[in-house]
Regions:
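Core segments of cupin and vicinal oxygen chelate
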Residues: 2, 9-50
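Vicinal oxygen chelate
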Residues: 4-14, 32, 43, 60-122
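Extended, well-structured beta-strand/loop surface patches
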Residues: 6, 53-55
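Structural preference for long, well-ordered alpha-helical segments within the folded cores
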Residues: 20-24, 81, 110
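A short beta-turn/loop motif at secondary-structure boundaries
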Residues: 35-37, 59-62, 96-99
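Short, charged/polar, Gly/Pro-enriched secondary-structure boundary elements
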Residues: 49-53, 111-114
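A short, sequence-level motif marking secondary-structure junctions
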Residues: 57-62, 120-122
């Protein structure tokens, strides 16, 4: 499995506050993606050349969820690997698909979350 990115993602109903906090810490907003899965907006923030954090606005979340965002070259391979290790997709087998990506949130048996994603290359 080839991993292409690895960084934290904060899924929250209060993205504006969290994005503002990271911007005050010196992170710069690189891009914003809207309409993910219908109503989620994701912000990619970068600090220098070394550090990234993603913040996703999800109004249906009762509280913040911090996960590890893992981008891979082969989504199906990584999804199957993680589910074979006991990770569960809380949405059943639902995969979020946009014109540029595929993603799913997977929860480990001990409760930590991985936001698995694949960036569709053109």
């Amino acid at each position: 499995m080839k991993i292409t990115a690895f960084n934290p993602i904060i899924v929250t109903p209060n993205a504006a506050e969290i994005v503002a906090l990271f911007e005050e810490l010196g992170f710069e907003r690189r891009h914003t993606k809207t309409g993910i899965g219908g109503d989620v907006t994701s912000y990619d923030l970068k600090y220098g050349d070394d550090f990234r954090v993603n913040v996703a606005q999800a109004d249906n979340m009762p509280q913040d969820l911090t996960a590890i965002r893992v981008s891979v070259r082969d989504f199906d391979e990584a999804y199957n690997f993680l589910t074979s290790k006991g990770f569960v997709n809380p949405q059943g087998d639902a995969i979020t698909e946009t014109p540029t990506s595929r993603s799913a949130l997977l929860i480990s048996p001990s409760g930590f979350a991985i936001s698995l994603s694949y960036h569709i290359r053109k």
